[in-house]
Amino acid sequence: MLDLIQTRRDLHQIPEIGLEEFKTQAYLLDVIEKLTTGKDFVQIRTWRTGILVYLQGSQPERTIGWRTDIDGLPIVEQTGLPFASQHQGRMHACGHDFHMTIALGCLERALEEQPKNNLLFLFQPAEENEAGGMLMYEAGAFGDWLPDQFYGLHVRPDLKVGQIATNTHTLFAGTCEVKIRFKGKGGHAAFPHEANDALVAASYFVTQVQSVVSRNVNPIEGAVVTFGVFQAGTTNNVITDTAFLHGTIRALTQDMSLLVQKRVKTVAEGIAAAFDMEVEVELKQGGYLPVENNPALARELMDFFDEKDGIELIDIEPAMTGEDFGYLLSKVDGVMFWLGIDSPYALHHPQMSPKEEVLAIGVAAVSSFLKKKAAE
C-alpha cells in the first residue's frame, strides 16, 4: 500500500518549474508503473512532462477525469523541515505535492478492480506559469481519452482539516497579466518643454485606470485591476523616455474579464494620445479562465460530501485567485473544490506547510466519490 506521507515528502523535495518537471515526472511514472503492473485495463501516455493514466471501463458509458497539477514555484523554502526542497530557489509552496500524492492514492484505490466507466488521471504540468492544461488540450494530448466530466481539488490553508469547500458557480477568478510601456522623449530635468515625460503619463494612467472597476464594473459582480510594478527613470535630474507598468486583471466571468481588458487598453491609449506619445499594451490571459463549476455536477458532489462522515462541507464564495483548471472546465463539464489543510501560512508563502493527516482524508473522500462516478 502506498505510503502517502513518504510519497508527499519525496515529492516535496524535488519541486520544479512548469515544463521542467523532469524529476517529478520520473518519480510519478515509477510509482504509477508499480501500481499498474499486471493491470491490462490500464494505458499510460506522456506529453512533455505531463502524464495521462487511462483506466478502460468494463462497460463504459462515459469517461470521468481527475486532474492534479505537478509543478512547483520559484520560491526559497523557509519551513525548516527535514524534507525541505533540495532544489535551490524552488518550493512546493502551493500544495501541488499534496495534490499529486492524493491523486496517486486515488489511482491506487481505483486499480483495485476494473471500473465500469472509464477513468482518466491527469498529472498536469505548468499550472503556475504556462497554463499546462490549455497546452495539453491544444496539442491534442487527450485524444479519445478526453473526459466527459472533469474534477480536481486545491488545498486551502485557512480551512480546517476535514473541511471541503466549493459552490455551484465560480470558484476561481479568471486572471490576465498586463504589461504597459509608455514611450516619450527623454531630456534634462531643467528643460521639460524639450522632453515628453513618460513617467508623468504613466502616473496619470495609474490614477485614471482606477475608474475602470469603480465605473465600468457592476459592483455586484466585482473585478480587480492591480499594478504591482512601476519602473521609470534612473536618476533624479533626467526626464525618462519610458515607463513600464506590470499588473493583473481578475474577474469572475470571462465576459467581465474581456470588458476590463478592453477598458484598460483604451485608457492607456487615451493617455498616450493626450501626452502625444506611444504606448505598448500587452494583455496575456492564455488559459487562466474563470473556474466555473457545472451547477448540476457541483450540487451532486456537494451532496455526496455533505453525507460523508468526517467531512464538513462549506458552500464558499469565489476567490479572486487564479487556476488554469478553468480552461479545461471551459471545454468539459466539471467541478473543482477546496480541501482544508489548516496552515498558518498562505499559499505561495515560503513557510507554507500543510498538515499531513489531510492526505488520508483527501484520498478517502476523493476515491469514494470517483468510485461512485465510475460505477454509475
Curated annotation (Swiss-Prot):
SUPFAM superfamilies xref list: Bacterial exopeptidase dimerisation domain (SSF55031), Zn-dependent exopeptidases (SSF53187)
Pfam families named among the record's database cross-references: M20_dimer, Peptidase_M20
Classification via InterPro entries: AcetylDAP_deacetylase (IPR023905), Amidohydrolase (IPR017439), Bact_exopeptidase_dim_dom (IPR036264), Peptidase_M20 (IPR002933), Peptidase_M20_dimer (IPR011650)
Keywords: Amino-acid biosynthesis, Diaminopimelate biosynthesis, Hydrolase, Lysine biosynthesis
Catalytic activity of the protein: N-acetyl-(2S,6S)-2,6-diaminopimelate + H2O = (2S,6S)-2,6-diaminopimelate + acetate
Tree of life domain: Bacteria
Record-level GO BP terms: diaminopimelate biosynthetic process; lysine biosynthetic process via diaminopimelate
RNA-binding keyword on record: no
Entry coiled-coil feature ranges: none
EC annotation from Swiss-Prot or TrEMBL: 3.5.1.47
Pathway: Amino-acid biosynthesis; L-lysine biosynthesis via DAP pathway; LL-2,6-diaminopimelate from (S)-tetrahydrodipicolinate (acetylase route): step 3/3
Recorded GO MF terms: N-acetyldiaminopimelate deacetylase activity
Enzyme class: hydrolase
Record has Translocase as a keyword: no
Active-site residues, record numbering mapped to chain: 69, 128
Family: Belongs to the peptidase M20A family. N-acetyldiaminopimelate deacetylase subfamily.
Annotated PANTHER family: N-ACETYLDIAMINOPIMELATE DEACETYLASE, PEPTIDASE M20 FAMILY MEMBER
HAMAP family attached to this UniProt entry: DapEL (MF_01692)
Function (record text): Catalyzes the conversion of N-acetyl-diaminopimelate to diaminopimelate and acetate.
Protein name in UniProt: N-acetyldiaminopimelate deacetylase
Provenance organism: Streptococcus pneumoniae (strain Taiwan19F-14)
